């Protein structure tokens, strides 16, 4: 007999795990809602042309790609930003700005599963479209930070700006391909590869750029880093403008952070401020990434629109938070014996409690009372209402506290007070 297994890189979530995920999801949603972001969702699959628009066909090996019955090439979404850009152009381009959206959904990447990395995973993120003001960048950073504070997660945020190194590349007349190669090596933290690439470029162009690049990468710290780097890059006008932009953003960020210009972000569409947030769990440290991408909407044939956003890796957040117990608030209603009259009374009681917002389970197995109580105990249900013939005729039921074992009679009219 075949025993079917879940696909490689996917997970089944047991009820206890789902309860914990729902608790964290609810707290993060609370923060998004408090900033008046509106929730959306997009199709699970999009055209491959959309998904590969920025990166080109080389992304094919990282996606789940298929053809529909009309021979159109489709792919399961690997993230949401491209889909949201398409959605914005379709539905929101004439909406008053800024457009503030958030989402929580599953994404798919065809890669080797490992700790904190799956083929199906969940992202929760935001996109703020229509404002190029520093305070818009700050709002997104603050929201990302406050979400993690809301769930009591220990973390560290690193903030940088792609324009600083880009200004250095421009000064030394590097091509876009050369600049992107260096960025990708920085993003991979491949220092040997970076040194080799810089040495090759220096030899080909007869320039000395390595020292300046590593000056930028090595300087990390608080806001004072900006003034120090402005001195070192005094002749690099574009870099100075990027540093001033970052300084204007940080004016509105009242949280602890580390300035780090080694943040390159793996996706090529970022254009300005970038940030990453790290937890403490080895192998799953990065829990959030984001930044500004002012050219993305235009790339998808929309009107030029500045944009900034971020995404949480929800699964990595779950790996980084301390384990916790979810308090059970459910109530079990059971008749002393199985009879239509008592079952109807149980249904009435359950209906009253459910309408008041309580989670109620009825005994659906016709168990004897002792076995019904054992079932409730096994499920961790702390309150059991026992419905007996004599008690119900007097307008009463028995309430049993499963933690203490205490049992008392209560009036039906007081049922909502339990």
From Swiss-Prot:
Main location per the UniProt record: cytoplasm
GO molecular function: ATP binding; histidine-tRNA ligase activity
Record's GO cellular component terms: cytoplasm
Keywords annotated in UniProt: Aminoacyl-tRNA synthetase, ATP-binding, Cytoplasm, Ligase, Nucleotide-binding, Protein biosynthesis
UniProt superkingdom: Archaea
Catalytic activity: tRNA(His) + L-histidine + ATP = L-histidyl-tRNA(His) + AMP + diphosphate + H(+)
Family label: Belongs to the class-II aminoacyl-tRNA synthetase family.
Protein's recorded name: Histidine--tRNA ligase
Protein's organism: Methanococcus maripaludis (strain C7 / ATCC BAA-1331)
Organism phylogeny: Archaea, Methanobacteriati, Methanobacteriota, Methanomada group, Methanococci
